[in-house]
Structure formats: structure tokens, C-alpha cells
């Protein structure tokens, strides 16, 4: 499991800021150092940018270009390099001897060889097209659940009042999310404060639940 995964939905009780994101990553780094593990990976969803205010992005210290409406053009920059630059600055300020490298994960993930699940899922969707066509269904997208049941999905069911498709957000109250954020990640808790003091003066500033106001 990855020591830290950061998605915008986890900030359901506080604002998304660069400071909180950096502290969450450092929280995982500190926990790994306490455990004697000298490596790790933090995944940060690029979606966090869409939940930040323009002021937060502008005050990050990163030089962005802006569109005609004054919004930062996020598509022109590498999000991984932005976070890594800010993270390295923070690590140096704390005096931590930790190196980090940015990796932008993009379309190459979609270009790997298909696995058994991919082959099965695509086959089900293909059969689903024929099934719904035979039933006279049109103007819909074919979907299949984990049981293989095929159903049509109409645009009107997923668009808002302005005709835009509503993004599907992670349900933080769902069992999968609870399992990941409660049991799979590694971060500072009150039980780690004493051990973490050898690396930072205020370990409570990196307490996972305090950062998210959980």
C-alpha cells in the first residue's frame, strides 16, 4: 500500500490548501522514519487543484499563466513538479534529510497491457451493446456492474441542471474509503508524538486527523 494518498474528497471538513497537503505528505515521511523505512510514495490527485481557491493557487509561490478570466491555467504545468518543489522547500526548512522525486502519472497508465479483469469487463460491455440494441434501447451508454448485469445509462441521469456531467466523487463514508484512510495509510497519530520529536519540534502539526479536522 502507498503510505499516503491525497484526494480532494478527504478534505470534507476543512479547506484544501498546499500547506495541508504538504503536511500530510511529511506526516507519512515522519511515520516511515519512525518505522525505520527509508522509502515511500505519496499519491496526490490532480483534482485537489480544482477544489482550491484561485487565491490559494496564486499565493503558492509558483508562477502560473492565467486565462482571460484570471484563472490559473493548470494544464500548462506539471502538478507533480509543483508539489515536489514546494515539498523540498518545506523539508529543507525542517532540516529533514529526505529526498523526493516527482513522477507525473498520466495517459501511460491507460496504455498498459490489459489484465484479466479488463478483458472480462470489455467483453461484458461488448455483449451489452448487442443486448441493449436487440431490446431497442438507444441514446444510452452501456454499463455493467460487478455481477455482470448490463444496464443502460442515460445522459440525463448524470448531468446537472446546466447540462454538464456531474463528477463522481469518492464517498468518504463508504466502507472502502474508511478501510483505506483508517487502516492502509501511514501517518502521525498522538501515539507517535514522542518518537516524532526527534525529527520535528511540533509533531502534532502533522497529525493526520487534526490536519483534516476529522
What residue ranges belong to the model's regions?
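C-terminal non-catalytic interaction/assembly regions of soluble proteins
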Residues: 57-214
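Accessory alpha-helical/coil subdomains and C-terminal extensions
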Residues: 1-98
Amino acid at each position: 500500500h502507498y503510505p499516503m494518498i491525497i484526494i480532494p474528497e478527504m478534505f470534507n471538513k476543512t479547506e484544501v490548501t498546499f500547506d495541508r497537503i504538504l503536511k500530510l505528505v511529511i506526516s507519512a515521511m515522519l511515520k516511515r522514519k519512525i518505522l525505520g523505512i527509508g522509502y515511500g510514495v505519496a499519491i496526490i490527485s490532480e483534482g485537489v487543484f480544482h477544489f482550491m481557491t484561485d487565491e490559494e493557487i496564486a499565493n503558492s509561490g509558483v508562477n502560473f499563466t492565467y486565462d482571460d478570466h484570471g484563472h490559473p491555467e493548470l494544464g500548462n504545468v506539471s502538478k507533480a513538479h509543483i508539489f515536489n518543489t514546494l515539498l523540498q522547500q518545506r523539508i529543507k526548512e525542517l532540516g529533514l534529510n529526505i529526498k523526493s522525486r516527482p513522477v507525473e502519472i498520466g495517459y501511460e497508465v491507460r496504455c498498459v497491457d490489459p489484465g484479466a479483469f479488463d478483458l472480462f469487463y470489455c467483453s461484458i460491455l461488448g455483449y451489452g451493446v448487442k443486448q441493449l440494441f436487440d431490446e431497442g434501447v438507444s441514446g444510452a451508454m452501456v454499463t455493467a456492474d460487478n455481477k455482470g448485469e448490463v444496464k443502460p445509462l442515460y445522459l440525463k441521469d448524470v448531468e446537472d441542471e446546466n447540462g454538464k456531467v456531474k463528477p463522481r466523487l469518492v464517498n468518504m463514508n463508504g466502507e472502502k474509503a474508511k478501510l483505506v484512510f483508517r487502516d492502509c495509510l501511514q501517518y502521525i497519530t498522538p501515539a507517535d508524538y514522542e518518537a516524532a520529536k526527534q525529527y520535528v519540534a511540533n509533531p502534532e502539526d502533522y497529525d493526520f486527523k487534526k490536519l483534516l479536522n476529522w
